[in-house]
């Protein structure tokens, strides 16, 4: 993942605060850091770990370096004004807003995954198709969720194009990550042969983590819904989505003298919320969308989904082994994974220290840029 969309990692905890000063400021600062790394030596060091390490250097070093590039001068203008004007408390708040969420992602393991590129993320490339499977860790959900959201954002930009292979984006437990641009992907991906499949426990989870507006867009844009047992507002929402049907009601009145029968019609929920909230395991309700030339008469269903166990078994037997991308064993067969991951971590930190030293030396040697170091 090199130099694309890195500021999305800052969006996860603040998705409902877009436009807030202390939310936008760190995004701008981190975007400037990423842009610098793309410029510096043709992007040789433009990786997410390098960006984190550079951001965590002293701002007395980082600001002059970034400002020395005309392309980045406007990015840094608010920060330089605060620094030169002595607004140190404001400046500290802005910088901390960028450092704190990203500092949680500093780890040798994450640096290993997000540094060198073993493969490209255009998974539906006709010349080099891939299957990419990633998972979150419940113990570090917020940390890895930001990293996964960053990958998702980049993948969506690459696969949602014409002339690619058919592909699918399948996400289970969606609320555990922030997927920037998910609503747009659902709305536009179908024309580019990209299927989007989202799994989550309840609509309330989506509203909590994505905000009411974005959650509503996601819920109302999807064309196919499969649901097991859910309760509360989710059950009511699904019941309303499935619509109503005209049903007959018959009532019988009996007294001493006679017996009367009345029949009337009334619009009732096709699948009541009470029924959705009491579904047993294996029972599903849902709705499917059709195409113009492939009409589906029965779009709403309430049934048991039967799994063909024998077919699943045959499919599992035909699985191919996962290719080894990186071999952590040495010539003697010893596992050196920890050592190699730590060496990569140390290398990235050393490279950033050298970048800062070289850039400060360049600025010091340039009479037109020396003034940037006067306030250092």
Segments (PLM) and residue ranges:
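N-terminal charged/capping segments associated with class I S-adenosyl-L-methionine
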Residues: 300-302
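Conserved ATP-driven motor cores of ASCE-family P-loop NTPases powering translocation/secretion/packaging/pilus
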Residues: 13, 186-188, 192-289
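P-loop NTPase motor domains
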Residues: 12-194, 209-210, 276-280, 288-295, ...
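A generic structural motif
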Residues: 162-166, 198-201, 249-257, 313-321
């Amino acid at each position: 993942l090199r130099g694309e969309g890195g500021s999305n990692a800052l969006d996860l905890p603040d998705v409902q605060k877009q436009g807030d000063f202390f939310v936008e400021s760190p995004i701008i600062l981190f975007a400037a850091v990423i842009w610098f790394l793309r410029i510096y030596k043709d992007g040789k060091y433009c990786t997410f770990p390098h960006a984190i390490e550079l951001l965590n250097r002293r701002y007395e070093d980082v600001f002059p370096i970034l400002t020395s590039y005309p392309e980045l001068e406007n990015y840094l203008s608010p920060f330089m004004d605060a620094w030169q004007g002595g607004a140190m408390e404001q400046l500290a708040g802005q910088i901390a807003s960028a450092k704190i969420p990203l500092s949680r992602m500093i780890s040798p393991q994450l640096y290993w995954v997000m540094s060198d590129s073993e493969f490209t993320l255009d998974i539906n490339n006709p010349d080099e198709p891939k299957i990419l499977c990633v998972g979150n860790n419940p113990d570090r959900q917020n940390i890895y969720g930001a990293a996964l959201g960053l990958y998702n954002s980049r993948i969506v930009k690459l696969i949602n194009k014409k002339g690619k292979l058919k592909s699918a984006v399948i996400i289970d437990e969606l609320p555990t990550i922030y997927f920037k641009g998910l609503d747009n992907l659902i709305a536009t991906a179908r024309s580019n042969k990209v299927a989007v499949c989202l799994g989550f426990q309840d609509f309330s989870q989506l509203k909590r983590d994505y905000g009411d507006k974005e959650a509503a867009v996601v819920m109302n844009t999807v064309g196919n819904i499969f649901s097991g047992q859910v309760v509360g507002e989710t059950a009511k929402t699904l019941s309303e989505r499935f619509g109503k049907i005209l049903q007959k009601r018959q009532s019988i009145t009996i007294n001493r003298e006679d017996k009367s029968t009345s029949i009337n019609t009334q619009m009732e929920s096709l699948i009541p919320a009470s029924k959705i909230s009491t579904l047993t395991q294996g029972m599903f309700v849902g709705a499917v969308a059709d195409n113009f030339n492939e009409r589906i008469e029965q779009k709403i269903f309430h049934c048991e989904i039967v799994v063909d166990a024998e077919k699943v078994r045959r499919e599992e037997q035909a699985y191919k082994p996962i290719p080894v991308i990186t071999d952590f064993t040495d010539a003697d067969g010893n596992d050196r994974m920890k050592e190699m991951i730590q060496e990569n971590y140390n290398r990235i930190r050393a490279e950033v220290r050298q970048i800062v030293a070289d850039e400060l030396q360049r600025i010091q040697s340039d009479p037109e840029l020396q003034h940037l170091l006067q306030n250092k």
